[in-house]
């Protein structure tokens, strides 16, 4: 699972979790702007925008921030955002997938090249890494809200496929991408708290590398995560 590695100590994972929260906020704002550009600023007639506004509220993004970015998105000067995916091989045969949302693909591509120049690894052709991963829907359930055994009893009933407990803060209820909305609704109906839902990449096989390669991969992953346009970084390192 993304971000889980035996070479990452507790402090490193805590720092990455805090950083991740800021990334989630930023991603939602970019999705909001994109939705306005595609379907207009009125949530009554723009279903995608309506969904993203609710998502922003669920993430406790202040209303004034939502309103400000709705106005910003309506401006002709505001560029639209595009989703881009990059594939890399790190050290010891570890595959890495980077998902970004950007208003300037040339800038993001340049940032990716800088990352591998500074931290190693190699950018590869589309499909070279993706075949090692499966696309899944994931509902993020706070561990503070429910115990694993109780949640597990709901997973199958709600249409989920699996429960991942490796994250320190959240359980991940995994499902087919097309089932994500219905699984979330079913979980909510059973009183389960879902802090976030999104599509993720799950490794089909894990690569066990030595300590030196593991630490080099973490340094590369951390650099990638700190690129402004990058939202998520996935890898298949144990």
Swiss-Prot record:
Its main location: cytoplasm. Keywords: Cytoplasm, DNA-binding, Transcription, Transcription regulation. Residues 9-21 have a biased composition (Basic residues). The keyword Cytoplasm applies. It is found in: Cytoplasm. One of its GO terms (cellular component) is cytosol. GO terms for molecular function: DNA binding. One of its GO terms (biological process) is regulation of DNA-templated transcription. Residues 1-21 are annotated as: Disordered. Gene3D superfamilies: 1.10.10.200, 3.30.70.980. InterPro entries: Integrase-like_N, TACO1_YebC-like_2nd/3rd_dom, TACO1_YebC_N, Transcrip_reg_TACO1-like, Transcrip_reg_TACO1-like_dom3, YebC-like. It comes from the Bacteria. PANTHER family: TRANSCRIPTIONAL REGULATORY PROTEIN YEBC-RELATED, TRANSLATIONAL ACTIVATOR OF CYTOCHROME C OXIDASE 1. Belongs to the TACO1 family. This is Probable transcriptional regulatory protein TC_0742. The lineage of its organism: Bacteria, Pseudomonadati, Chlamydiota, Chlamydiia, Chlamydiales.
